[in-house]
Amino acid sequence: MLKIVDTNILLDFPQILDEEKDIIILVEVLRELDGLKLNPSFETSFKARRAAVTISHHLSDITFKDCYENLTKSVDDKLLLCADECFGELITNDVYLKVKAHIKGIKSRGYGSSESYSGVRTVFLQTDENRYHKDLDFMMNNH
């Protein structure tokens, strides 16, 4: 089965190109990676450059598609269209994109770590540290 890979997978798990076969990368995904290499975040720009190097090492193993260039749809919509037309599987860790794929009856899956980012970090304070924070002007999270 053909596998259409989203930008976030190439950023976070470029080794997918070593581990999976029949990979399709849209030119729009390459454009996103190219733009991200200049991102002010060192981590993001590093990941974009690392993805580019990994892709360059696998050029003969990857199918690149540029057939949706004239469409004014989002990159996500183009990924869905490609997965649908190619009867492929969309590989993304974008939750909303996986939901859209499910709605359209397109097979999709995540890749890599099953731990998703919650946006929350739990910090345990010692009793004396906790006393310091009680005088600050913010409300403690009760959840």
Name these PLM-found stretches.
Residues 1-89, 95-142:
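Active-site-proximal, substrate-binding regions of enzyme catalytic domains
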